[in-house]
């Protein structure tokens, strides 16, 4: 009995989803295989780590020190974060603290610049 590939495909085309599911299970049992999708391989060692560092897309703006002009720094923090006066003051008083987390590089750099111009010491992480 010769089996024609086209006849097999035509037979598959006429099957319902339930029948196809039963067929897959039967093939798995008969040949000892699994129809589960394979996981993608993990990134390599040091080369993968260096590439990940270069491709960083989210940054944290960290206020490391309030500086002498605390009022200006509080105003800058309020502008950047949209916090209320008390929350912004608490954040500035509690330095070093994250001002913003997970922001794009351009936004993070602008926030650091604004804080530095206000008299604070800030950094990008």
UniProtKB/Swiss-Prot annotation:
Quaternary structure and partners: Homodimer. Part of the ribosomal stalk of the 50S ribosomal subunit. Forms a multimeric L10(L12)X complex, where L10 forms an elongated spine to which 2 to 4 L12 dimers bind in a sequential fashion. Binds GTP-bound translation factors.
Function: Forms part of the ribosomal stalk which helps the ribosome interact with GTP-bound translation factors. Is thus essential for accurate translation.
NCBIfam families registered for this protein in UniProt: L12
4Fe-4S in keyword set: no
Swiss-Prot/TrEMBL GO biological process terms: translation
Name of the protein: Large ribosomal subunit protein bL12
Any one GO cellular component localisation term in the record: cytosolic large ribosomal subunit
Keyword annotations from UniProtKB, A to Z: Ribonucleoprotein, Ribosomal protein
Record-level Gene Ontology MF annotations: mRNA binding; structural constituent of ribosome
Similarity-based family: Belongs to the bacterial ribosomal protein bL12 family.
Species annotation: Delftia acidovorans (strain DSM 14801 / SPH-1)
Cross-referenced InterPro entries: Ribosomal_bL12, Ribosomal_bL12_C, Ribosomal_bL12_C/ClpS-like, Ribosomal_bL12_oligo, Ribosomal_bL12_oligo_N_sf
